[in-house]
């Protein structure tokens, strides 16, 4: 009965958008936007209303419905679903836009690039080649109205209404009856000439020539306009002329047309087309080919269309990471494409992959993530950072690779604002204490101090009181000169976090001791910091009512704003991820290394002390704490220091990594120190003021004194101590040499709470080790020369009687 009947359109799983139809092509179909009811995903719906008086058009529409349903090709409009009733036909395809509408919209936004047009035409020609050569079908409707563009910018061939078989089955081509479409018919169809000698692709290739003309010049007014190429690129004109030639026999096959355009210098021979062709076949490519492709992809992404990167490159990158073996090379193009996404898309597509990557054991993957953290840190929420990312990142502090340890330290600058109380004030501080005390690489100890100065404002008040003074005081005793500079600047950058009592009793005594440091850069920074702290104390002394205002931040809760103010004093930018030591190591690696070998203790009595080694321009302070009485030399140092933020932190992973591994005395010193600990368990350095922490994570001084070697006979000197190339050095270049002797002699006689070490013992042992190594090399060289002489004598054979050979 009729009231039990159901409306098939209402039960259809897709619904039409209420918006008016968009640019429907000429023909029986009307194009609507739509969506899937279950998921809301966008689709395109072609609708044909059956009319009793248009039976011929109805048959054409049903034939097109059948063709589109059975034909599957990447360059042909993708069929999703369909509905056929007595009243209408619905064909659901992927979401597309008519080419004419797409070109008009892009022209208003600046126009399409030739790269996009070359790939779009490549796709249409490839679809024609599939139809004609593989399916023996003639499209018979190639024009602007039959081409559609998806959201990735891919061109799709549609308009299959008038398709027929090239083998003659089923009669001739169907009649169109639409003037807008018949104007693209080749001339031989109009006058009936040349039918017997034309190829099966001749008519479609003529229509392809019309499409090319319209793409570059706009709508075709009449067939005679094809004689003028207009704006068609010069590299495409010769091949275009073959398409619109009067003789149908000379029109090329679609496959040969593609081959001609892909030749060197051809219109379709470019990086964009090559990238698309590789992506189409990426599933069958070798792993080595994929690695090379992804490595080179980042350079080309800047010239590629944004929609193409978002909707075609990004899915391939995600698939390659999840199911392939691409590894770390995927990260650079992945984050580059991520810039085109909004916050919601980034959370859905990129962040799950990033979180999964942090659990990888691949070192290359981990260091790439740390280096590029600045690009995605803003999209990470605090629970994700604390539960899924930080537990994996902290493993980098214990890694044997110095580059990973350094990058892990630098990443804390970005993670600190998102860490919870436990991870920031307990877990992270333990690792920082271990690195600053035990790491054998001077730049890593220096960068740890730099990072601590930048994140100091995020720490709780109790942690700041317990950690900052201890850590920066330890840094001022480091034998690596940039670390001592970092300690001084750390005090200055966090000056608002100390009470006046701490400034007077803890900080100023440490800074005053640095005024006789062997390195001028350290002395300069120490004097600046002393003046700034003294000015605060003096202002409070003159007006005690200012004490509350000056100490307002001492017991305040952690505040990012405080960190920004502190960082500006030393020119540190949180978003810039700059390194204090990068300039010293990258620009002057030999000078930076020499600092670790400069004697930090005076020479034996009666021997001339070596002159202090000058260092490159080191960071100086700039901002409200600078005084007006600074000298011209100090101002020049300040201008050089302002460029810290322009430097890169990548110091260890490049040339300095190999040099430091060979020459840094810290490796030798630590090995000797650990050997001394193993032989004498009772020999332990005193704990620092931060003694409440576990031994592993406290700021106690863990650098042990090696047992001093037997002293040489009086008056003897090592060969390395002589100045072979010039006059004997004197103390004139260093006016504080005498003061330094007394100061350091006093430091040897007592043990303060920071566990000061005898760095002279380390250096003496290092020099002896180098002398022993040189002696062994000489002995080995002598043995090699003797062996070569023996081989030469044996090769000459026995000497003859009565003769004498001279060797």
Curated annotation (Swiss-Prot):
BP GO terms, sorted: retrograde vesicle-mediated transport, Golgi to endoplasmic reticulum
Domain comment quoted from the record: The protein kinase domain is predicted to be catalytically inactive.
Region (Interaction with COPB1): 792-807
Superkingdom to which the source organism belongs: Eukaryota
Record's subunit section: Homooligomer. Interacts with GORAB. Interacts with COPA, COPB1 and COPB2. Interacts with AP2B1.
Comp. bias intervals (Polar residues): 667-691
Function text: Regulates COPI-mediated retrograde protein traffic at the interface between the Golgi apparatus and the endoplasmic reticulum. Involved in the maintenance of the Golgi apparatus morphology.
Region Disordered, residue ranges: 14-35, 592-807
HEAT repeat start-end pairs: 350-388, 389-427, 507-545
Source organism of this protein record: Bos taurus (Bovine)
Protein name: N-terminal kinase-like protein
Entry's family note: Belongs to the protein kinase superfamily.
Record's compositionally biased regions (Pro residues): 18-28, 601-617
Residues annotated as domain Protein kinase: 14-314
Cell inner membrane recorded as keyword: no
PROSITE patterns documented for this protein: PROTEIN_KINASE_DOM
Start-end of Acidic residues biased regions: 632-656
Keywords carried by this UniProt record: Coiled coil, Cytoplasm, Cytoskeleton, ER-Golgi transport, Golgi apparatus, Phosphoprotein, Repeat, Transport
């Amino acid at each position: 009965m009729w009231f039990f009947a159901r409306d098939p359109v209402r039960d259809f799983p897709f619904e039409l958008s209420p918006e008016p139809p968009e640019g429907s092509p000429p023909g029986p179909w009307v194009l609507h936007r739509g969506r899937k009811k279950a998921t809301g995903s966008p689709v395109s719906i072609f609708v044909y209303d059956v009319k009793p008086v248009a039976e011929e058009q109805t048959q054409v529409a049903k034939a097109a419905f059948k063709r589109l349903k059975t034909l599957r090709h990447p360059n042909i409009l993708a069929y999703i679903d369909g509905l056929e009733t007595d009243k209408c036909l619905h064909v659901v395809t992927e979401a597309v836009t008519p080419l004419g509408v797409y070109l008009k919209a892009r022209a208003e936004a600046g126009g399409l690039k030739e790269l996009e047009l070359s790939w779009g035409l490549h796709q249409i020609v490839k679809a024609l080649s599939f139809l004609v050569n593989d399916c023996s079908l003639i499209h018979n409707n190639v024009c602007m109205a039959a081409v559609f563009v998806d959201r990735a910018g891919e061109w799709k061939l549609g308009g299959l209404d008038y398709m027929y078989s090239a083998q003659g089955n089923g009669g001739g081509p169907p009649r169109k009856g639409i003037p807008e479409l018949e104007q693209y018919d080749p001339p031989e169809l109009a006058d009936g000439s040349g039918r017997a000698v034309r190829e099966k692709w001749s008519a479609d290739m003529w229509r392809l020539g019309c499409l090319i003309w319209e793409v570059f010049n706009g709508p075709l007014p009449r067939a005679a306009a094809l004689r003028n190429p207009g704006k068609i690129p010069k590299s495409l004109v010769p091949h275009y002329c073959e398409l619109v030639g009067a003789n149908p026999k000379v029109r090329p096959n679609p496959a040969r047309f593609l081959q001609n355009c892909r030749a060197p210098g051809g219109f379709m021979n470019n990086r964009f087309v090559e990238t698309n062709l590789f992506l189409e076949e990426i599933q069958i490519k070798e792993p080595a080919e994929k690695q090379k492709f992804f490595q080179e992809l980042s350079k080309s992404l800047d010239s590629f269309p944004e929609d193409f990167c978002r909707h075609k490159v990004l899915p391939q990158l995600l698939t390659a990471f999840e199911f392939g073996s691409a590894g770390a090379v995927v990260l650079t193009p992945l984050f580059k494409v991520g810039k085109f996404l909004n916050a919601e898309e980034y959370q859905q597509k990129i962040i799950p992959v990033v979180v999964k990557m942090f659990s990888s054991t691949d070192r290359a993957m981990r260091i790439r993530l740390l280096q590029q953290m600045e690009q995605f840190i803003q999209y990470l929420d605090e629970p994700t950072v604390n539960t899924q990312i930080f537990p994996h990142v902290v493993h980098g502090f214990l890694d044997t690779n110095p580059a990973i340890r350094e990058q892990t330290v630098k990443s804390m600058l970005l993670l600190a604002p998102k860490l919870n109380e436990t991870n920031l004030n307990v877990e992270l501080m333990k690792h920082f204490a271990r690195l600053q005390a035990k790491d054998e690489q001077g730049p890593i100890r220096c960068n740890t101090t730099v990072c601590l100065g930048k994140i100091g404002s995020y720490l709780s008040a109790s942690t700041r009181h317990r950690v900052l003074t201890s850590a920066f005081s330890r840094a001022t005793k480091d034998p690596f000169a940039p670390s001592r500079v970092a300690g001084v600047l750390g005090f200055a950058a966090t000056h608002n976090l100390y009470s006046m009592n701490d400034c007077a009793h803890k900080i100023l005594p440490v800074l005053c001791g640095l005024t006789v440091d062997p390195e001028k850069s350290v002395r300069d920074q120490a004097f600046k910091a002393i003046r700034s702290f003294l000015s605060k104390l003096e202002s409070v002394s003159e007006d005690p009512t200012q004490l509350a205002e000056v100490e307002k931040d001492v017991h305040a809760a952690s505040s990012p704003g405080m960190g920004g103010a502190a960082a500006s004093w030393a020119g540190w930018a949180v978003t810039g991820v700059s390194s204090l030591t990068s300039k010293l190591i990258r620009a002057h690696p030999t000078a930076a290394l020499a600092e670790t070998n400069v004697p930090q203790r005076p020479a034996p009595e009666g021997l001339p002390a070596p002159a202090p080694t000058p260092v490159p321009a080191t960071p100086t302070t700039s901002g409200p704490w600078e005084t007006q009485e600074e000298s011209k030399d100090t101002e020049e140092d300040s201008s050089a220091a302002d460029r810290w933020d322009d430097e890169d932190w990548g110091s260890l992973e490049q040339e300095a990594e190999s040099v430091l591994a060979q020459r840094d005395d810290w490796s030798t010193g630590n090995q000797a120190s650990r050997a001394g600990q193993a032989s004498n368990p009772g020999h332990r350095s005193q704990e620092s003021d931060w003694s409440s922490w576990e031994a592993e994570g406290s700021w106690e001084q863990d650098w042990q004194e090696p047992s001093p070697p037997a002293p040489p006979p009086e008056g003897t000197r090592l060969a390395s101590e002589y100045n072979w190339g010039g006059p004997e050095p004197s103390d004139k270049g260093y006016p504080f040499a005498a003061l330094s002797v007394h100061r350091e002699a006093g430091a040897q006689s007592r043990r303060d709470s920071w566990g000061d070490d005898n760095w002279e013992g380390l250096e003496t042992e290092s020099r002896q080790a180098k002398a022993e190594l040189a002696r062994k090399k000489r002995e080995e060289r002598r043995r090699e020369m003797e062996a070569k002489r023996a081989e030469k004598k044996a090769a000459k054979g026995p000497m003859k009687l009565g003769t004498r050979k001279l060797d």
